[in-house]
């Protein structure tokens, strides 16, 4: 249950976007109301997009007045919307006086996928990611995570729905464990957004203890930012690998999907020219994943200022993919979307206060 810490700029009123179902039920019990009120309020907030208690006509006037006195519905403030030539949309959201995050909608055939951020910045320093350049400022609250979905859904036409959510935006979701889990529960709640567990995907760089914790409380889809077939190279690209090396990470992935192997882990692999894209890398990746229920998503690198990397040539990516497919690995190559509005994978940067000096060094304890 999310205990819903009160945001720093509201000392008395609870932001109801911070509450998953259990938290909302507990909130109503504290008010002396029946727990079923939680379902009513979740529908008003998440399905209808209502933030004015006065419009919630199936609640008594007395209850509406009490809610007004002790709580609020405060999504992040939308400060900028951009549309790409390919249909991708990016929303820049103000989450406090100095910080902004970005969320991206990727429309495709028969689906609308929303890429959601979990932190302001990121502490993991992956060398190919522009978000890592800005450092880390803070975790997002549950309200700020689910608020991205709230804003996006209610910016779409009435007949359109967000069909998939991927926690692949700014930040490492497993380093904001409680708030992320609470937000995913709201995503899947039938009285909120009603997404199936297969349509909610969490992408992690490999925080092994937190991945094991996730297996205990959730079974949403899992993606892993792998990007290299061996520890030496991954240590350079994804420094958290020095704490949780590939062998430990793959073992945790196998524990997550369970013994029946009915689901597959998606392994993300950014294609960097001359770095991790040679034929021997492809063959090593085949060997590495041979005993893990997996599929591979190859990601063409998206350049950003002062990056040391270049994207692999399309022919190189195609040959790499063919090697994996010939070995029986399900392999896809991600379409590059939203590059003209800096919304492509690895390009989200937002706005972080004093970004270089306030990098947060997390103690990743078991």
UniProtKB/Swiss-Prot annotation:
InterPro entries: Aldolase_TIM, Methyltransferase_A, RlmN_N, RNA_MTrfase_RlmN, rRNA_lsu_MTrfase_RlmN/Cfr, rSAM. Its cofactor is [4Fe-4S] cluster. GO terms for cellular component: cytoplasm. Pfam families: Radical_SAM (PF04055), RlmN_N (PF21016). Binds 1 [4Fe-4S] cluster. The cluster is coordinated with 3 cysteines and an exchangeable S-adenosyl-L-methionine. One of its GO terms (biological process) is tRNA methylation. The keyword tRNA processing applies. Residues 108-340 form the Radical SAM core domain. The keyword GTP-binding does not apply. It catalyses: adenosine(2503) in 23S rRNA + 2 reduced [2Fe-2S]-[ferredoxin] + 2 S-adenosyl-L-methionine = 2-methyladenosine(2503) in 23S rRNA + 5'-deoxyadenosine + L-methionine + 2 oxidized [2Fe-2S]-[ferredoxin] + S-adenosyl-L-homocysteine; adenosine(37) in tRNA + 2 reduced [2Fe-2S]-[ferredoxin] + 2 S-adenosyl-L-methionine = 2-methyladenosine(37) in tRNA + 5'-deoxyadenosine + L-methionine + 2 oxidized [2Fe-2S]-[ferredoxin] + S-adenosyl-L-homocysteine. PROSITE patterns: RADICAL_SAM (PS51918). [4Fe-4S] cluster binds at residues 122, 126, 129. Keywords: 4Fe-4S, Cytoplasm, Disulfide bond, Iron, Iron-sulfur, Metal-binding, Methyltransferase, rRNA processing, S-adenosyl-L-methionine, Transferase, tRNA processing. Belongs to the radical SAM superfamily. RlmN family. Reaction proceeds by a ping-pong mechanism involving intermediate methylation of a conserved cysteine residue. Specifically methylates position 2 of adenine 2503 in 23S rRNA and position 2 of adenine 37 in tRNAs. m2A2503 modification seems to play a crucial role in the proofreading step occurring at the peptidyl transferase center and thus would serve to optimize ribosomal fidelity. This is Dual-specificity RNA methyltransferase RlmN. It comes from Methylococcus capsulatus (strain ATCC 33009 / NCIMB 11132 / Bath). The lineage of its organism: Bacteria, Pseudomonadati, Pseudomonadota, Gammaproteobacteria, Methylococcales.
């Amino acid at each position: 249950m999310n205990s819903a810490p009160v945001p720093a700029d509201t000392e008395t009123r609870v932001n109801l976007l911070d509450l998953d179902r259990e938290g909302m039920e507990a909130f109503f019990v504290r008010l002396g109301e029946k727990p079923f009120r939680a379902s009513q309020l979740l529908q008003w907030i998440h399905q209808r997009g209502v933030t004015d208690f006065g419009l919630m006509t199936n609640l008594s006037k007395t209850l509406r007045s009490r809610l007004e006195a002790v709580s609020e519905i405060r999504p992040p403030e939308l400060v900028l919307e951009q549309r790409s030539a390919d249909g991708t949309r990016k929303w820049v959201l103000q989450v406090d006086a100095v910080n902004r995050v970005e969320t991206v909608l990727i429309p495709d055939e028969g689906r609308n996928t929303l890429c959601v951020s979990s932190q302001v910045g990121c502490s993991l320093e992956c060398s190919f990611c522009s978000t890592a350049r800005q450092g880390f400022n803070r975790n997002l609250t549950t309200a700020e995570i689910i608020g991205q979905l709230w804003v996006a859904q209610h910016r779409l036409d009435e007949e359109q729905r967000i069909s998939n959510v991927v926690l692949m935006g700014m930040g490492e979701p497993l380093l904001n464990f409680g708030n992320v889990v609470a937000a995913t529960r709201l995503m899947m709640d039938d009285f909120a957004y009603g997404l199936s567990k297969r349509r909610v995907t969490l992408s992690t760089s490999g925080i092994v203890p937190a991945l094991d914790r996730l297996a205990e409380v959730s079974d949403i889809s899992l993606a892993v930012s792998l990007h290299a077939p061996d520890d030496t190279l991954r240590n350079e690209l994804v420094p958290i690998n020095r704490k949780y090396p590939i062998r430990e990470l793959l073992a945790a992935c196998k524990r997550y999907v369970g013994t029946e192997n009915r689901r597959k882990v998606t392994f993300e692999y950014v294609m960097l020219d001359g770095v991790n894209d040679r034929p021997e890398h492809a063959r090593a990746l085949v060997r590495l994943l041979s005993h893990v229920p997996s599929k591979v998503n190859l990601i063409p690198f998206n350049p950003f200022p002062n990056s040391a990397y270049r994207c692999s040539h399309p022919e190189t990516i195609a040959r790499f993919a063919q090697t994996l497919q010939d070995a029986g690995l399900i392999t896809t190559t991600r379409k590059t979307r939203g590059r003209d509005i800096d919304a492509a994978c690895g390009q989200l940067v937002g706005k972080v206060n004093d970004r270089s000096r306030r990098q947060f060094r997390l103690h990743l304890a078991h």
